[in-house]
Curated annotation (Swiss-Prot):
CDD domains: Ribosomal_L18_L5e. One of its GO terms (biological process) is ribosomal large subunit assembly. InterPro entries: Rbsml_uL18_euk. This is Large ribosomal subunit protein uL18. GO terms for molecular function: 5S rRNA binding; structural constituent of ribosome.
Length: 169
């Protein structure tokens, strides 16, 4: 792969398509803790990460799997679960003494109304100061699960409200 004296091999994580170092550099320059949102098909994970010279240090991790403890028994990969995970993360983040952060979505697409921004809305609603634009948040009917109820007939809204009250209460 590295042939010729003028060729420079990119960093391994850049070659694998896992890290955008230009964005990472800008996030670290802010000197704020990063609120890292990662989504899969079945789960949402949010982490509080601080950059140090030895390497990044993870202070807090919240997964949407934890919502089962708060009475949310539906899918943990949808928009209501992302919001509740963000809300739970925000409460735990404030309990640790961190009241601000900066959003790190990694290589996820920057789509208005996505699960990433539903999680961010949960973090912001918990009282954490994260720079954002309100236009990127999904509308309240999607966050509460009314769209899922209309589509599948499963009542997500009541469990969403109960879990939200349990997290905030």
């Amino acid at each position: 792969m590295a042939t010729g004296p003028r060729y420079r091999v990119p960093f391994r994580r850049r070659r694998e398509g896992r890290t955008n170092y230009h964005v990472r550099y800008r996030l670290i320059l802010s000197r704020k803790p990063r609120v890292v949102v990662r989504k899969g098909n079945a789960n949402i994970t949010i982490q509080l990460i601080i950059a140090e010279l030895k390497g990044d240090r993870t202070l807090l991790t919240v997964s949407s799997k934890e919502l089962r403890n708060y009475g949310f028994q539906h899918s943990t990969g949808n928009v209501p679960a992302a919001y509740l995970t963000g809300l739970l993360f925000g409460k735990k983040m404030l309990a640790l003494g961190y009241n601000e952060g900066i959003l790190d979505i990694g290589l996820h697409s920057n789509s208005r109304g996505s699960r990433v921004y539903a999680a961010l809305k949960g973090v912001v609603d918990a009282g954490v100061d994260v720079p954002h634009s309100p236009e990127v948040f999904p509308d309240d009917s999607r966050i509460r699960g009314e769209v899922i109820r209309d589509y599948t007939g499963v009542d997500v809204v009541s469990q969403f409200e109960a879990a939200r009250e349990k997290i905030l209460g």
